[in-house]
Each structure stands twice: as C-alpha cells, then as structure tokens.
C-alpha cells in the first residue's frame, strides 16, 4: 500500500510511509532536546514510564526531571531545548535545577485551563529552584509551602538563573500559607516575570522579593503586565535592590484587609546602580513612601507615567498621572 507524502507542521505526529517523520524523543519544535509528558491522573502513568508519549506519561515532575538529567548526561548539549509538558492535576514535587546536572534553555509548560489547571503545591521547601540559565516556566498554578517560594532564582557563583522567563502563572499564597511567590537570591540577570497573577500573601511573605545578595543585586529584571491583589507585600526586598529593571503595565490593588492592609506595593531597595523604569502601572492606595511606594535609593529611577488613585500627592498630577518618584 502506498501512503501519500503530506507536508505538515512540526507539532503533528509522524506519518506512515514518511521516513524520518517520527522520532523517539517526542514532538519537538527544534532538532535537539526531548519532550516529556507528565500526567498524574493518567491510568498508564508511572515514575518509570517512557514519558515521550502522552499515552505513556510519567506520573510526577520529579520522574520527568530525572529522565531529563539522564538524557543530558548521555547526549551532552543536545538536551538543550527540552520541554516538560504537565497535564492538569495536583503535584507535590520539590525540584532544584542546578547547572551541573541540567541543560540550559528548557521549558516547563502547564497544559491546564481555568477549570482544570496544573497545581504545584510542595509539602515543604521551594516548589522550583533554578540555578541554570534560559528556562521558561509557563501556565503553572503555584501554591508555595510555608518555608519556600513558588519559584526561586539564584546566582551565587558568577552564573545562575539568568534569562529565566516566568509567564502565565498564578502565585497563590492561600491566605497566608505560602512564604514567597518569586524569590531572587543573588543577581540573576535578564529575568522576566510577565502576565502572571499574585494574590493572598501575608506579612513578611511577599509576592516578589530579593532575600540575599551574595554576589550582587538582580539586573535588568522585567516585571510586566502582572496583577497584584489581596496581599500585604507585593514587590519588595529583604536585601539589596533592583538595578536597571523595568516594572511596567502592572496592576497593584489595595488589599481588602482579609489578611491585612497592603503595606508595600513597590520597594526597590538599595541596588548598586538604580536606573529602574517604573512606568505605565496602575497604583492603588497612598502614593508615598509611607503608603508603600519606595524608589531605589540612588535617586535615578524614572516613575513618571503611572496611573495613581492618590491625586492629592504633589508627585501625582490632577489627571492621576505620576510626575515624579514617590516621596515621604
């Protein structure tokens, strides 16, 4: 029997009679890397499954990461560009991605929706700690543990989680249960947090924070188009500060008080450079230092062009547009 040779897009499976159209490493968008499927609810799922077939998936994220590490050790650099695809369900893994065992430039993709999402809720510690470059995290509902972050990004020895992208995720503090949404430790550069939702973090449990600066402060962090609500602290620092970063297009909402009033909307701390751009955001509450808005201490940030509800401040025009950094 002759089968037609049909040209199709890369995301279609291989076809009978088309040499080379099927591969043993899963559906991929580039020639290197591997695609591994995780589905804790699938009847065929096990921790020892092949994982490259969605009908023979791995049951845990931990098992998928072990497969990726083994593949990387076997093929060296060809593991770059790998993807972990996670089906809807609740996962309790705690993953630490290091620079030695894991390849750079890989993706973790949650394939859920508003009704059935991918919930990542570790029993303890960080859900995901990254010390490797270029990873993409997309579509995950993080519920951090009481002693960890949803995602922790590190840079402690001259290299680390630079170029990380976190997008389309929900960081859910569960009314004060989770410790941090996204935690920076050290100075990972060029990290992007975009189109995410942060909510329900309590006092000393900020949505985004820097906890330590053993090398330097984060550089060129982009925090774009996120929503922050029902939390006491949104973007703040426990050490250091942000440098040459852009915070744009975000929506900061004053908490209703179920946990407590919002005390910190943005505190950019004390970086080594400053030069942050805080533009095009919506600011609720009191636009002042006492109200929870604090520029980086070098005095060279740009906070012009935000929408603020507090038109009584001298730093806010009568039209609600900020014209200067927040003051005391």
Which residues does each PLM region occupy?
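Parallel beta-helix/beta-solenoid
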Residues: 79, 100-104, 123, 132-133, ...
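Extracellular beta-strand solenoids
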Residues: 18, 38, 86, 93, ...
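Solenoidal tandem-repeat scaffolds enriched in leucines and small polar residues
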Residues: 170-231, 235-238, 242, 247, ...
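Short, T/G/N/S-enriched strand-turn elements that build extracellular solenoid repeat scaffolds
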Residues: 62-77, 91-101, 126-130, 152-156, ...
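Glycine-rich repeat segments that build the extracellular carbohydrate-interaction surface of secreted
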Residues: 36-41, 59-92, 106-112
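Right-handed parallel beta-helix/beta-spiral solenoid domain characteristic of secreted/periplasmic
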Residues: 94, 103-152, 173-175, 201-202
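Right-handed parallel beta-helix/beta-solenoid
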Residues: 2-63, 307-311, 327-328
């Amino acid at each position: 029997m002759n089968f037609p040779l049909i040209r199709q897009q890369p995301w279609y499976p291989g076809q009978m009679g088309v040499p080379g159209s099927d591969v043993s490493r899963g559906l991929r968008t580039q020639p290197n890397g591997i695609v591994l499927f995780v589905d804790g609810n699938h009847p065929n799922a096990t921790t020892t499954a092949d994982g490259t077939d969605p009908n023979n998936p791995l049951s845990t994220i931990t098992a998928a990461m072990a497969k990726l590490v083994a593949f990387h050790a076997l093929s060296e650099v060809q593991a770059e560009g790998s993807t972990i695809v996670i089906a809807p369900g609740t996962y309790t893994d705690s993953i630490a991605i290091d620079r030695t065992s894991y390849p750079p430039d890989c993706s973790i993709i949650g394939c859920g929706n508003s009704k059935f999402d991918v919930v990542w809720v570790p029993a303890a510690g960080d859900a995901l700690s990254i010390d490797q470059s270029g990873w993409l995290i997309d579509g995950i509902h993080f519920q951090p543990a009481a002693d960890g972050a949803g995602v922790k990004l590190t840079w402690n020895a001259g290299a680390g989680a630079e170029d990380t992208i976190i997008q389309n995720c929900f960081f859910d503090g569960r009314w004060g249960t989770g410790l941090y949404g996204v935690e920076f430790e050290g100075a990972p550069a060029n990290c992007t947090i975009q189109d995410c939702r942060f909510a329900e973090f309590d006092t000393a449990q900020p949505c985004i924070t820097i906890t330590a600066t053993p090398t330097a402060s984060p550089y060129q962090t982009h925090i774009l188009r996120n929503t922050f609500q029902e939390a006491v602290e949104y973007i703040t620092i426990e050490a250091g500060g942000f440098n040459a970063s852009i915070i744009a297009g975000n929506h900061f909402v004053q908490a209703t008080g179920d946990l407590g009033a919002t005390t910190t909307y943005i505190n950019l701390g004390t970086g080594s450079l400053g030069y942050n751009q805080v533009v095009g955001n919506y600011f609720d509450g009191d636009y002042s230092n006492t109200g929870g808005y604090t520029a980086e201490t070098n005095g060279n940030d740009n906070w012009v062009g935000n929408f603020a509800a507090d038109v009584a401040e001298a730093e806010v025009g009568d039209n609600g547009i900020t014209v200067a950094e927040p003051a005391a």
